[in-house]
Amino acid sequence: MKRLRYIGTISILLSTLLFFSCGTTSQIINEPAEDQPLTQAPEPESQHKKHDKDTITLLFAGDIMAHSVNYYITTYEKIWRDVREVITDADLAFANIEAPLDRTKAASSYPNFNMTQKYVQAAVDAGFDVFSLCNNHTNDQYKNGILETIKTTQAITQYTKESFGNDIYFSGTKETADSKLPALTYNYFEANGWKILFLPITELLNRPDASDYINFIKPDSDSRKAFIKYAKELRQANPCDLFIISIHTSEPEYTRNITERQNQYYMDLLEAGADVVWANHAHIIKDRKIVVNTKNGRDKLIMYANGNTISGQRTKPELTSKNPASERDNTGDGLFYIVTMHREKDGSMKIKKCEPYFITTYINTANEYVIKPLNQDFVDYLYDVPRTNWAKYIERRIKINKEATKDLIEWQ
């Protein structure tokens, strides 16, 4: 019999228990000129701290977006400056790039996004290693935009490897729709002595164009059953320590509700061999669930949505509201979910620790959108500056996120 328990603490220790859209504006952006080199990150040669080889720490972010307001900043490095240490402390950090990267066109915002190479490079420099490229905005620039995205990500990968020796992984788009090639693109690599299999998919697209060039799985029952079978066979063909599936899910945006159909689908994927199901699309934070003592002795994890990591969706936060919990206010916060896993000698895998690290998109006095930790230290800073309305707002947002989302443990 399954038992589900709510865990109310920030850090979970399991070692012993074992009608809004994505838009705010619709315009072409003239990206500010930058005198800085392509990368800004300090000490990139030691991007991640090293851990015991039988232990791996993963950080899962949410959606990296770029609305017009996000481009108006002196340097993109500033976006990540106050959370970089948290990201680099993990062995691997994952994020979803929610836009094409077509260097032949100008940057653009909602409804047809196009992100710049430098914007994504800043996220890489901040410590992210693994990116999903498939979501409802992947084909915003049509087929050519997908092909240009692949070229841009290859350039980022090559530049980062040659300059700093760091391996970066992108998947979710395809160079050809030839049915003779593998149906979906994925990453299969080794990190810190762990073999990782990463497979991203999207269940929705904003237009039908070039869907064959994207890891697109329709959300109907037959397509999901076929994907479960595919995932099982993929793991069998690629022996790994961790199999992570990213899903840009066909569920309503801006709601914390989790449907039983959605939950069962993710549980079926765990049963088929996935160790982690990492879902996004809601643009707000949802619950997490740790599945303990599964039949094969492997602890597993579901993240239902980690919200926006960076965006311009919250342009007018309700600073003076006593309960700033509107849909737009919720889009301004995100989650870094930090998971520590341990390989046992008998081949089982245990989740030792899960830490929800809440973040928020802050609009500074220069009207720049930057990521800040959603914690008391940031509140104290705001009172000292002083930006009293912001301080009170962040206090309320901390309370809302702690009360509205939770970590669950399910024993099987």
Annotate each predicted stretch with a short phrase.
Residues Y71-I73, E77-R81, Y188-F243, Q262-Q264:
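Binuclear metal-dependent hydrolase catalytic cores centered on His/Asp/Glu-rich metal-binding motifs
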Residues I29-Y142, T149, I156-S163, D167-F170:
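N-terminal catalytic scaffold of extracellular/periplasmic and nuclease hydrolases
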Residues T104-V124, C240-G273:
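Active-site-proximal segments of metal-dependent phosphoesterases and phosphodiesterases across multiple
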Residues G127-V130, E260-L335:
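Conserved beta-sheet core of the metallophosphoesterase superfamily
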Residues H67-S68, L101-T104, S132, T138-I150, ...:
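Active-site environment of divalent metal-dependent phosphoester hydrolases
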Residues A90-D102, C134-N136, L205, A231-R256:
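Short acidic, glycine-rich surface-loop motifs adjacent to enzyme active sites
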Residues L18-S21:
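C-terminal motif of bacterial Sec signal peptides marking the signal peptidase cleavage site
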Residues K49-T55, M65, N238, Q313-Q412:
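A short C-terminal boundary segment appended to hydrolase-like catalytic domains
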